[in-house]
Amino acid sequence: MVSLSHYLVLGAVLFAIGVVGIFLNRKNVIILLMSIELMLLAVNINFVAFSYYLQDIAGQIFVFFILTVAAAEAAIGLAILVALFRNIRTINVDDLDRLKG
């Protein structure tokens, strides 16, 4: 039987992979977005695990809202990335300094 601690360890590992992805790849915008989405997924796993453990459906409902916001965030982030790539021809974070005064 899979216990609560298994889900919490899985969530912690996924969150740690996301944090490591952010710290190791600060130059590529796509990897930054993927790492943030992985961290959100880890939080969602913890919400569902605690919701199941406490026999409360509110955590699972909250996960649907988080997934909706995460999908919208990913779509907007990728749209901005495509627009920047068309203008600047790069996705390197260091080259995205046009708004600096």
From Swiss-Prot:
Signal peptide: none annotated. Keywords: Cell inner membrane, Cell membrane, Membrane, NAD, Quinone, Translocase, Transmembrane, Transmembrane helix, Transport, Ubiquinone. NDH-1 is composed of 14 different subunits. Subunits NuoA, H, J, K, L, M, N constitute the membrane sector of the complex. InterPro entries: NADH_UbQ_OxRdtase_chain4L/K, NUOK/Mnh_C1-like. One of its GO terms (biological process) is ATP synthesis coupled electron transport. One of its GO terms (molecular function) is NADH:ubiquinone reductase (non-electrogenic) activity. NCBIfam families: PRK05715.1-2, PRK05715.1-3, PRK05715.1-5. It is found in: Cell inner membrane. This is NADH-quinone oxidoreductase subunit K. One of its GO terms (cellular component) is plasma membrane. The chain crosses the membrane at residues 4-24, 30-50, 61-81. Its EC number is 7.1.1.-. Its main location: membrane. Belongs to the complex I subunit 4L family. It catalyses: a quinone + NADH + 5 H(+)(in) = a quinol + NAD(+) + 4 H(+)(out). It is a multi-pass membrane protein. Coiled coil: none annotated. NDH-1 shuttles electrons from NADH, via FMN and iron-sulfur (Fe-S) centers, to quinones in the respiratory chain. The immediate electron acceptor for the enzyme in this species is believed to be ubiquinone. Couples the redox reaction to proton translocation (for every two electrons transferred, four hydrogen ions are translocated across the cytoplasmic membrane), and thus conserves the redox energy in a proton gradient.
